[in-house]
Amino acid sequence: MSYQPSLRAMTAKTYGNHSRIEGGDVKGLNVLLLEDHISTGLSCLDAIRALREEGAEVTQVMSITNYAIPETMRLFEEQSIQTYDVIRFDRVVKKACEMGVINDEQAALVMEWLNTPWTWAAMHGVVAIAREN
């Protein structure tokens, strides 16, 4: 198994080949995108779009942590992207509850936010500035 590391940039460089992709040509390569964290997924999906525009095949993303917000997961499904993660946030909440860091009521509130963050924010008087992570 061989691989060629390629890094992504949020915006195209203003010099050189003006590419968002560094580390070599990705055309025709099957790319596994690695992320530290997925919240809304928008920056990750933007990177996938950039890689696909350069000819890469991207069908999988792996992250260390993932909120796994239902709306976010639907966005990945719509793009035929399978997500893998080391730790989902619901496990963090469960462990915090087990350790006594938060109680059951607090855990339920966090999980309510996690399942519908924008609706939850509106219901609790929080103004969501953007849906970007």
Q: Residue spans of the language-model regions?
A:
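PRPP-dependent phosphoribosyltransferase catalytic core
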Residues: 49-133
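Short, glycine/charge-rich flexible loops or terminal/linker lids adjacent to PRPP-binding catalytic cores
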Residues: 1-32, 40-46
